[in-house]
Amino acid sequence: MLVKAGEENAGLMDIGGGDLPKQQAVLDVRAGSSVLGRARAFGGLHGILPWLYPTIHDVFPFYLAILVQTSGNPQALRLLARSCIEPHAVRTDLERLVWDKPRACSEQSADFPVGRAWSAPNLVRRMCALNQDLVSSARSEEAALVFIARGKAGCRVISWQSIHDCLAEFLHRHALASFHLSD
């Protein structure tokens, strides 16, 4: 089944010029309806999407873990830049995560020990590696941001509404008390 899925993805990626195509693009090619029919066996184009690209459901756990570690403003951290990791000014055993706070027109930072696998800076590195292939497809103003995901609308930074939706799912799944992120 996995080999067939890989072959089907290759055909779809050929039709899409290296990207997962829209349904109409598949139908526009000869034998497109049969390709689409075979794709349906794997959940259709939308079902194949998470096999190829990080989606909001992949990105949200990184966002939440970094948010908890930094105690940052949730809206400001949503717009965290890929260039946010800096060496500490004085100590070599620390590194700094720096982000903009647009409404306050200021910068905020938090320091973390170097080399900790699950520290916020290393989570940023992991997230950037995971979604590196999406950067070239993202909007120019969003390409430099950490929390880019692929969805129905293309490659975008995760939306504030999507974060709230994922948080509600997370709280429900883990039977946690309800709380809301506020800006």
For every predicted segment, state its role.
Residues L2-E8, K22-D183:
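Extended accessory and catalytic-adjacent subdomains in large enzymes
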